[in-house]
């Protein structure tokens, strides 16, 4: 299957209207708050000599950090506009980017064929994917791992919806970066808590470790407190 035209269009329009400034996207947090601590959870299980594929890489902020911890990093995203952002911000042979629809089974299989068994980093992709597409996204993780790769997957929990609703209910309405998410009809924290581990295991993945965390955002409540969204992380291998 492939994602719907509306879903693809929403992400294209979002990234076309996003500036080159770090943090303009609400989830574009500094790697010291995201990919760095996530890498520390993945590294005990992963071979750093393998490539790591950043699924849903956006403008590549986390991908560029991952390239400092692994032999090579490849960022992929559904949005051509996001990949354009990532390429403009990146220099060096250890990082590259390409457009990829994770629900396109043949394209994912082709990427695995080119890279071999890879490590995978996926931050907050399944939770906002269209319901019919979520199994294919989980399957893409398994396909890219092959027999030897390891994955770090972190997804928002249902508690994030309460945080987002509280942020949107301020006297002035949603803060600007969150308002832009709603304007483009993106749907954060849409998956049920039990759906994520079920999809991962149904895709043939084994959970090696899991825990609770938050995903810091680049937006704030009216009182200046940073918006941190509750999430659950998983370190995974193929069964």
Task: Name each model-derived stretch.
Residues 1-113, 129-136, 140, 146-239:
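Class I (Rossmann-like) S-adenosyl-L-methionine-dependent methyltransferase catalytic domain
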Residues 120-121:
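A conserved beta-strand element that flanks and buttresses the S-adenosyl-L-methionine
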Residues 125:
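Hydrophobic adenine-recognition pocket in adenosine-nucleotide-binding enzymes
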């Amino acid at each position: 299957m492939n994602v719907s035209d509306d879903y693809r269009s929403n992400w294209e329009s979002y990234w076309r209207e996003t500036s080159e400034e770090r943090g303009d996207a609400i989830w574009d947090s500094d790697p010291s708050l995201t990919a760095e601590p996530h890498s520390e959870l993945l590294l005990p299980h992963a071979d750093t000599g393998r490539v790591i594929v950043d699924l849903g890489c956006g403008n590549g902020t986390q991908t560029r950090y991952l390239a400092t911890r692994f032999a090579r990093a490849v960022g992929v995203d559904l949005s051509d506009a996001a990949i354009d952002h990532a390429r403009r911000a990146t220099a060096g042979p250890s990082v590259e980017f390409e457009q990829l629809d994770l629900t396109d089974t043949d394209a994912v299989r082709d990427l695995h064929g080119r890279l071999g068994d890879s490590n995978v980093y996926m931050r907050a992709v399944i939770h906002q994917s269209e319901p019919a597409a979520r199994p294919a996204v989980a399957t893409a993780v398994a396909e890219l791992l092959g027999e030897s790769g390891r994955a770090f997957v972190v997804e928002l929990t249902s508690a994030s919806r309460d945080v987002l609703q509280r942020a949107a209910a301020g006297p002035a309405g949603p803060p600007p970066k969150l308002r832009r998410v709603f304007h483009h009809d993106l749907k954060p924290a849409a998956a049920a808590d039990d759906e994520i581990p079920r999809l991962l295991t149904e895709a043939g993945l084994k959970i090696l470790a899991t825990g609770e965390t938050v995903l810091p955002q680049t937006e704030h409540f009216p009182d200046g407190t940073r918006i941190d969204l509750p999430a659950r992380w998983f370190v995974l291998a193929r069964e």
